[in-house]
Amino acid sequence: MGRARDSGKRSGGPPCSFLLLLLLSCGGGRGKSLLGAAGAQDFHIKVQVYENGDLSPLASAAVEIFGNQSSLASGVTDQDGVAVLGISYRLGTWVLVSATKRGFVTNSVPWRVDRLPLYASVSLYLVPERPATLILYEDIVQILLGSPGARSQPWVQFQRKAARLPRSSTYNQLTSSLTTASTRHQMRGFPAFIGTEPESANGGNTSWVELLPVAAISVHLFSGNGSEVHLSGPVQLSLPLPPESGLTTSSSVPAWRYEPKVGVWIRSGMGLVRRDGQQLYWSFVSPKLGYWAAAIPSSGRGMLSLMSGVDIAGYHTIFLLSILGALTLLVLILLCLLIYYCRRRCLKPRQQHHKLQLSGLSEPKRDQATSTSRLNLISTSHLDSTSTADSDLRTPVLRSAFSSREDFCKSGGRSSFQHSADTLPLRPGSRDEYPLKSARSGDLLESEDSKRGYGTGGKGQQRRRGGRGGVRDPPPSPPPLPPPFKHVIGDSKPPDYLMTQSADPLSRPTSLTQPGQFIFCGSIDHMKEGSYRHAMPTLVIPAHYMRLSSEENQGGQGEEQSESESGSTQVSHAHHFAPQDHAQRQQLLQQGHGYQQGATASSQDQEGKGWGNHGSVTIPVVFNESTMAQLNGELQALTEKKLLELGVKPHPRAWFVSLDGRSNAQVRHSYIDLQAGDKTRSNDASLDSGVDVNEIKVKLGPEERSGKAQLQPSNLTYSKLVFAEEGEQSLSESRTGGGCSPEDSSLTPLLDEGSETCLPMSRRGRSRGDSSRSSTSELRRDSMTSPDEDLNDQSEGGDDQDKKSPWQKREERPLMVFNVK
């Protein structure tokens, strides 16, 4: 028995535990339900249904309450149109109370309280449906309000085959109803416009949205027994819109369908607004008949825009396009800034390089003094010219007729070659003449042409005599430029630099010094190293200071002395015209000598002697202080001579010192005899001379006039050539005597400009008559200024006063003396 009991207890253990767990689960479920229902309270709502027209109560109307998209309670009205429904209500929640009856439009209202009332009553007013006009065609069925073809009326159209008729019904028994609403008062007869999304209606989130209706329609199709006919095909809806709707053509308005099972409007697509004449219509294709509305969600931002007459799609399109345009404009601005920045970065090195190239243009402007440099006047004297026929006709200094320096050199080279070949053999005073050559010092001393010109001086008289015969054969072609002149062709300075340099004759040369130049500057010790770093000092050395080894071997001393005394070699940096002109003139002069030599010798001698290499140039004189003083005096005389040739320009009446703080050791103070002679025109050489250089012009002889008539003036520029005439010694000697002081008489041979016995060499039409000089004058000038005679005088034991040249004595005179008598 005990075992049986124990076994029974053991066997009954599991069923007891199972029952216990079941009871606990049920108790938990009850507790959970009690907790869930703790917030809800039960109470009863009285619903009264009336007809909207005469406010008579409607009996047998179906009443239903919806909350949380589900039916909370339902009932039917009695004869008085009243129904009492009890619900479990949670304070603060929304519920929908609806009433439905056949032949009337379903109506519903939202209801909500925050405090539990003791009694609540809701009244609904149903609007009777309006019978519609039904037109049956073979293919379609139309439902209208009013007569067919009338405007501004709603209509519904569907396919005839889409209607599912009962077996006991025919098309002749079909009836329809069509009710529309477009105003706020009419909208109250339709169910409350509370919408939701399709996902919420199918059991999703319970979010309701308040709608703003534009138009609503209720359309139904009934059979003969009163049952509703369903359709299986699409239905076309067209509703007229009121003018105050604010919609525009092609605007899109959402379509909402009323669902009786949940009591809310469900979104079912999008309708389109179209215009027919002056009337707007909302068109939509629905899947079935029933309650449809064109409404806009009030919570959406698109509602306000659509109500103001702006399409929501167009609004968004314009908004997006505006954003895109702003972004595009921003990108363009950034791109322009990037291009501008890159352009500045790329052009900045070029601008710096351009500034480095044009830095020389600002150098002449640093010295703003009004003093005149005689070296510049000497080197630039070939730029000024006077016409032989008419002295009033002037030519400008700048040759602006040529677009570039290369064109000027090409045209100048051809013309100068032809003119020189024609005029050199025909000059009657060319026996004892030697050209005054001016070129770069390094180029002059190193060029083979210059050596060749001095080397052939021994036979120059024979060639000149042979040239008097008038035999004129075509001259040989000039040889190519020697190596020292090759850099002249490749000059890289721009034309604007030449224009600027020629426009400022007082400017210092800005090119760097070249190898082989003579550099001398009396005040270089007082200057800083950087002051003349970019300036090239210039030294002018007369020809009789230099000796050629070839002259000692080939020519006699008499001819060498006469040749060296007849001219001087000027070494300067010609910065007004391109150096090609000097190189071409050197070749032309040497070519002329070679041509006259070929008239008396064979072609082999002409090639061997005319263009052969000769000895180099030597300067036996030591450039000490006394020599430089004598050289300075000769340069002063040469300067005054050039100033006389440049008589077309008014000479400055004073010398001024540079204002930029630089010292000038060459400043001179002298006077001008303003009472010298009864002459109407003054040809003062300079303020330093103190003499009157007006002299009586000697008439031309018949031989000179005939030779002058044969030569025509040319408009091309050539270097200045000075010729000394042997036959005019008496004329020069007769003018040395005069009523001048010894100092003035020393200037007479240098300033003698009255001789016009030489034929003019055309240099822009300038006469060569004023440039002639007698041999006696040259010998007298050399006797006064030659360093050889100074050395002889020193060896003879002369006193210190005899060692000084007249120019040195003149420098020791009192300063700033005016009108001394």
From Swiss-Prot:
InterPro entries cross-referenced by the UniProt entry: FAM171, FAM171_C, FAM171_N
Positions annotated with a glycan in the UniProt record: N68, N205, N225
Polar residues bias spans: 499-512
Pro residues bias (residue ranges): 473-485
Keyword Ubl conjugation belongs to the record: no
Extracellular-side positions: 32-317
Keyword DNA repair applies: no
Compartment(s) of residence: Membrane
Domain of life: Eukaryota
Keywords, in A-Z order: Glycoprotein, Membrane, Signal, Transmembrane, Transmembrane helix
Biased composition (Low complexity): 585-599
Region (Disordered): 411-512, 550-613, 727-821
Entry's Gene Ontology cellular component terms: membrane
Membrane topology recorded in Swiss-Prot or TrEMBL: Single-pass type I membrane protein
Signal sequence coordinates: 1-31
Chain segments annotated as transmembrane: 318-338
Cytoplasmic face residues: 339-821
Biased composition (Basic and acidic residues): 800-814
Residue spans of biased composition, Acidic residues class: 787-799
Family note: Belongs to the FAM171 family.
Protein name: Protein FAM171A2
